[in-house]
Swiss-Prot record:
<comment type="similarity">
    <text>Belongs to the TPP enzyme family.</text>
</comment>
<keyword id="KW-0456">Lyase</keyword>
<feature type="region of interest" description="Thiamine pyrophosphate binding">
    <location>
        <begin position="388"/>
        <end position="470"/>
    </location>
</feature>
<comment type="function">
    <text>Decarboxylates branched-chain and aromatic alpha-keto acids to aldehydes.</text>
</comment>
<dbReference type="InterPro" id="IPR029035">
    <property type="entry name" value="DHS-like_NAD/FAD-binding_dom"/>
</dbReference>
<feature type="binding site">
    <location>
        <position position="465"/>
    </location>
    <ligand>
        <name>Mg(2+)</name>
    </ligand>
</feature>
<keyword id="KW-0460">Magnesium</keyword>
<keyword id="KW-0479">Metal-binding</keyword>
<feature type="binding site">
    <location>
        <position position="53"/>
    </location>
    <ligand>
        <name>thiamine diphosphate</name>
    </ligand>
</feature>
<dbReference type="GO" id="GO:0000949">
    <property type="term" value="P:aromatic amino acid family catabolic process to alcohol via Ehrlich pathway"/>
</dbReference>
<dbReference type="Pfam" id="PF02776">
    <property type="entry name" value="TPP_enzyme_N"/>
</dbReference>
<dbReference type="InterPro" id="IPR029061">
    <property type="entry name" value="THDP-binding"/>
</dbReference>
<dbReference type="GO" id="GO:0030976">
    <property type="term" value="F:thiamine pyrophosphate binding"/>
</dbReference>
<dbReference type="InterPro" id="IPR047214">
    <property type="entry name" value="TPP_PDC_IPDC"/>
</dbReference>
<dbReference type="InterPro" id="IPR012110">
    <property type="entry name" value="PDC/IPDC-like"/>
</dbReference>
<feature type="binding site">
    <location>
        <position position="438"/>
    </location>
    <ligand>
        <name>Mg(2+)</name>
    </ligand>
</feature>
<dbReference type="GO" id="GO:0005829">
    <property type="term" value="C:cytosol"/>
</dbReference>
Length: 555
């Protein structure tokens, strides 16, 4: 609170702090500068400025994935539209971000004045209407109902795990009000006792004495149901897999973890167990083109229990309203109470780690991802940008306690660099590892300096394969539109404000090995590694998906 007394802006900030937000991302603009005075004065919230609104939105997304809530502040029109891509990505991938937009005063709006950052027609709700397509709740705040509307939007964002939009005019932000007197209303979503009872009965009948197999995905994490999932996985010997979207959702070092299921692009052993399971539970699963081998999954609904956010389906029969956690708990109870202990799975063949290449061997995609997977340690938060980084690492098992973040549905290249900033601020006790291609990094690299400003020490790996390799794999191998300008990457950290970063340029396996060894030993500064790869050296999984994408686009 500032010397102006307690305001609507203070109320909003207190509610955000109540939801666990301690950093607010954004770019200043004249329609929210007074509100930002209250942000920087708040005892529990820190302002984190972005190089641009898109980057700030991506950073908020990365923060929200770990914290469960994030906030972004932009100015009217020009600022909010610059952030719209990031907000749309958060909507697609179920990330709770509150987008706070500073607007011209209510007097200006009522008079339909032609002020800057507008379309010049006196209509101040163009962008509010646009926001309805990419947010779950919106409000144009007015003094009489501002606090009630703030509570409504924040509750919806928290419940639905999707972005919300608050339009707050300059005079509304400074309008006097009272602090909250009760906790923010939390909606449970609701489970009908009858729906739960009927679901349990149907699931018990379908499961019988069969071994249960589980395919889990990202929505389990978004809805806060990881503990309930783990309870199910430990109720019996339960073979399980995830989609790439849900990678690191479960402990990949478990003997019951099968690997990544991606339809026809899966390893044969994983595909066989999932598709031939007597009873398969799909938990929080959303099949999209790039995580399902372009919809090549073969899941028999008659043998499937599908656990969704608010409903579940047993062999085609729908049960609702039924929360995900309640359904998972019911399945765990069925296994625990039936008195049958499934035999242990036969030991999986020990993974055949290829011998390390000679130190002077030219670096390849295979060697890069093998060595990077080996370098990751418990507690790391790995952000892999869409493309060779995401698909190169997705097939490797991660150490217990590693968190993997990607964006396979929205698939906006460049997202992970600012998102790594947000993730690092969300949990400073964990080291972030950023894996990003050269083309993607050119879109958002301005945010690199913020890591130094905020005291973060990530490992940054830029995959330099001389352009848009994913696009080359789909179409236009030699086309000019898949080329990018060559940059002197290792000079960028210093140029952008991180002069103490350690930088490496690796063209051989030995150079990569040395760089990653130093990175593991150096925790007090950024380690920036440029790796040189052939432009058409493509991870096998990505190669298969690129062929499918090319075929789909040709139809």
């Amino acid at each position: 609170m500032t010397d102006d007394g307690y305001t609507v802006g203070d109320y909003l900030l207190d509610r955000l702090a109540e939801l666990g937000v301690t950093e607010v991302f954004g770019v200043p603009g004249d329609y929210q500068l007074e509100f930002l005075d209250h942000v920087v004065a708040h005892p529990r919230i820190t302002w984190v400025g972005g190089a641009n609104e898109l980057n700030a939105g991506y950073a908020a997304d990365g923060y929200g994935r770990l914290r469960g809530m994030a906030a972004l502040v932009t100015t009217f029109g020009v600022g909010e539209l610059s952030a719209a891509n990031a907000i749309a990505g958060s909507y697609a991938e179920h990330v709770p971000v509150v987008h706070i937009v500073g607007a011209p005063s209510k007097d200006s709006q009522a008079a339909r004045r032609i002020v800057h950052h507008t379309l010049g027609d006196g209509d101040f709700e163009h962008f509010l209407r646009m926001s309805r397509e990419i947010t779950c709740a919106q409000a144009n705040l007015v003094p009489a109902t501002a606090t009630r509307e703030i509570d409504r939007v924040l509750s919806e964002v928290h419940e639905q795990k999707r972005p919300g939009y608050l339009l707050i005019a300059t005079d509304v932000a400074r309008f006097p009000t009272e602090p909250p007197t009760a906790p923010l209303p939390r909606h449970s979503g609701g489970t009908s006792p009858r729906a739960l009872s009927l679901f349990t009965e149907a699931a018990t009948q379908l499961i019988g004495e069969h071994r249960l197999t589980v395919l889990a995905d990202f929505l389990v994490h978004r809805m806060g149901c990881v503990e309930a999932l783990n309870k199910l996985l430990t109720a019996d010997t339960v073979p399980h897999a995830t989609l790439m979207w849900g990678k690191s959702l479960v402990d990949e070092s478990s003997p019951n973890f099968l690997g990544i299921y991606a339809g026809a692009a899966s390893e044969g052993s994983v595909r066989e167990v999932i598709e031939d399971a007597p009873v398969l539970v799909t938990a929080g699963v959303l099949f999209t083109d790039m995580v399902s081998g372009f919809f090549s999954q073969r899941i028999d609904p008659a043998r499937t229990i599908d656990i969704g956010v608010n409903q579940s389906v047993v062999a085609g029969q729908v049960f609702a309203p039924l929360d995900m956690a309640a359904a998972l708990d019911a399945l765990a109870s069925i296994l625990a109470e039936r008195g049958i202990e499934s035999p242990a799975l036969p030991p999986a063949p020990a993974p055949q780690r290829p011998a390390a290449p000679p130190r002077d061997a030219v670096l390849t995609q295979e060697a890069l991802w093998d060595r990077l997977a080996e370098a990751l340690t418990p507690g790391n938060v790995v952000l892999a940008d869409q493309g060779t980084s995401f698909y190169g690492l997705a097939g490797h098992r991660l150490a217990s306690g590693v968190t993997f973040i990607g964006q396979p549905l929205w698939a906006s290249i460049g997202y992970t660099l600012p998102a790594a900033l947000g993730a690092g601020l969300a949990d400073r006790d964990r080291r972030t590892v950023l894996l990003i291609g050269d083309g993607a990094a050119q879109l958002t690299v301005q945010e690199l300096g913020a890591f130094g400003r905020e005291g973060l020490t990530p490992v940054v790996v830029v995959v330099n394969n001389n352009g848009y390799t994913v696009e080359r794999a789909i179409h236009g191998v030699t086309a000019r539109y898949n080329d990018i300008t060559a940059w002197r990457w290792t000079e960028l950290p210093a140029a952008l404000g991180v002069p103490d970063a350690l930088t490496f340029r690796c063209a051989t396996y030995g150079e990569l090995d040395d760089a990653l060894t130093v990175a593991a030993e150096t925790q007090d500064r950024m380690v920036f590694v440029e790796v040189m790869l052939e432009r058409m050296d493509i991870p096998p999984l990505l190669g298969e998906l690129a062929q499918s994408a090319s075929a789909a686009n040709a139809k």
